[in-house]
Structure formats: C-alpha cells, structure tokens
C-alpha cells in the first residue's frame, strides 16, 4: 500500500506485540523519540542519495533502523556496485491512523530483483508468523 494511502477503518488493539495505534501525529512520534522508545529511519538512505527531509523519515522502535541499514549496506549496496540492481524503493505500510509504520517493504530491481519486508507491529507480525509455519500438507 503506498504511503499516502492509509487504512481508514479503526482496527482495535493488535493481537500481540507493541501497539502504536495512539501515535497518530509526528509530534507524538517525536515525543517517543525523546523518551528513547522510537528512532528515525530513512526510507531512502543517505548513502543512496536520500535527503534529510521529513518525507524521507519515518519513526520506528529502537533497533529497526539498524536492521534496515544493515540490509541496505550489506545486501543491496554490493548488488548495486556489481550492476545487478539499479532501482530502489522502501515503502512504509501503516495501520489505521498511526504515524508509525507497521511494516516497510524494500524492493530493488533491474536487471535482478531483491525484495524483503521488515515487519514492525500489528498485523505485520502475524504475517511473519505465517511465513514461519511448516507446511501442513
């Protein structure tokens, strides 16, 4: 789902994991950054030409930015340097009116393709559990 489209339906409390449903403004997110609960994450990293711009920054629980940065620098950057990838996007997926993304989908392509999703909270964590279940067939 593109970042400018948010699910309008109120979803209630997530089944498990953290709940950022009430963090519905940038100001509330920045207050949690000040408390040490959230950190900024660059969608397009500075190493790839990403700007220091509020539209390029989302706020996530501590540690998530390191996971994305590691993926960008240790997986994608070498593939870009070898000519295997030329296009890059990192798209946040939101839950309800929350300002905190519940997942970030990273895609890089041309001529090869790389995709991954960083699941952060809410239903995105359920998707992660579904992927880990053994095939029951």
Language-model features: locations:
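Glycine/proline-rich, flexible active-site/cofactor-binding loop segments
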Residues: 1-28
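Domain-level detector of nuclease and nuclease-like folds
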Residues: 19-137
């Amino acid at each position: 789902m593109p970042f400018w489209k948010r699910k309008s339906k109120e979803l209630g409390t997530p089944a498990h994991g953290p709940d950022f449903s009430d963090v519905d403004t940038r100001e509330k997110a920045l207050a949690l950054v000040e408390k040490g609960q959230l950190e900024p994450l660059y969608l397009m990293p500075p190493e790839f030409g990403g700007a220091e711009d509020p539209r390029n920054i989302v706020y996530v629980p501590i540690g998530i930015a390191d996971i994305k940065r590691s993926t960008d620098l240790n997986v994608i950057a070498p593939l870009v340097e070898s000519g295997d990838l030329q296009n890059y996007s990192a798209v946040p997926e939101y839950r309800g009116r929350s300002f905190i993304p519940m997942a970030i989908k990273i895609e890089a392509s041309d001529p090869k393709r790389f995709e991954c999703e960083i699941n952060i909270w809410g239903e995105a964590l359920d998707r992660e559990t579904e992927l880990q279940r053994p095939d029951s067939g």
